[in-house]
Amino acid sequence: MFFNIKLFENMITSTQKRLQNGDIMIKHIVNKIVAKGCAVILAAVTVGTTAFAGISLSGTEDFASIFGLNVVYGAPADTSSASSVDENGWPVAPEIVSGSAILIDADTGAILYDKDSHAISYPASTTKILTGLLTIENCSMDEIVTFSKEAANSVTWEDAQLGSKAGEEMTVEQVMYGMLLHSANEMAYALAEHVSGSLSAFTEMMNERAKELGALNTHFTNASGLHDLNHYTTAYDMAMIARGCYNNPKFVDIDSTYTTYTIPPTNKTTTARTFKHRHLMLKGRQYEYEYCKGGKTGFTDEAGCTLVTFAEKDDMRLICVCFKSDTNQRFIDTRNLFDWGFANFKKITTSGGDLSSLLTSDSYYDSRVFNQYNLDLNLNAATLTLPKDMSVGDVKIDLDNNYNPTSNNGIYTAKLNFTAKNNVVGMAALRISTPADLAASSNLP
């Protein structure tokens, strides 16, 4: 028998990487009541890549936008106080190493930081947060999951797994903990089959739900994030997906667990399975961050190191996504961006009158969009995320004259620009519908 030493070395290197990595627009609806013409206009704000301000409207519903072994501790950036500002009065963010990253406010959807966030990336195991969200939305935690032969055999010895066996039974909640904390790939497969009957049906559900959450360039082919050329997303899209997860209390309850979790013996094994969360910013871990509320790690050779993290301080909840990163650097980058975000931004609640004062007939009236209607527009009260030295008075709203309004079966769509201090902070897609359209919609308050 001949021993392939090169193959053995490659296997060891791959295993070390996996051990090392801990893993084997703003879009909100703005209701505007039209005094004449009995039309309702919906604005879905989609923040561009340089956007920082966000708006969260009370009494509204989101809809998809129409328009990814040796521990080395790095020194954090100095973010103990508010950082300097650029020539437009905008906070200057810390330098990071991750190739693609984004920092958003989980409540308003405001984009506080963006680095090539629309670049196509492989998400690796961060995919599992969407698998978890769909499971919570479609199952009870006490339902019994039976592992199929396909699910049990879907992993190799070097993949993250918990050794589940064909025919083994666990509760949905136990499988969720195994997937989100330990990153067990066969458990993601089993949940997909339990929810939808097959992996292919589940991935269709994943792609549809991702769009509903605001993803623009995402396509998933599996429930775990194992590499596939057609399994991709962007940091921006993953932040939108993570926002849906962070706003689900049951998801946060499971994902924020920093103590050990044990799956007791089952019908196929007499041995209990005990494990901890692989996210190293949780309490008691190497990169402990006191405001960390969970998240998900990921790694494949093709994706590099990936990371989704939730954090909360005072009244602000932030989400950070780092893709195309290194083993330890993703945690350092995330911590520095969180510190910078908490130090430099604030949330303010405004009255409808405050926002309505931004509207002028010149900004909104355009015969190409509204035809014969003479509009009287009103906005609900809102929460905004802005740099600490800015106010709602710094925000301007204008109709984009370079965008030609489009029509789809009599429903017109136009575009607004939101700016502050000469920065384009957002874009709004205006949809105009008739009273019949309004009556048919169950999503409107």
Model-derived features: where do they sit?
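Gram-positive cell-envelope targeting signals
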Residues: 1-62, 445
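Membrane-proximal envelope biogenesis segments
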Residues: 46, 58-83, 89, 106, ...
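Domain-terminus/edge residues, biased toward the C-terminal soluble/receptor-binding domains
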Residues: 215-216, 229-232, 236-237, 242-445
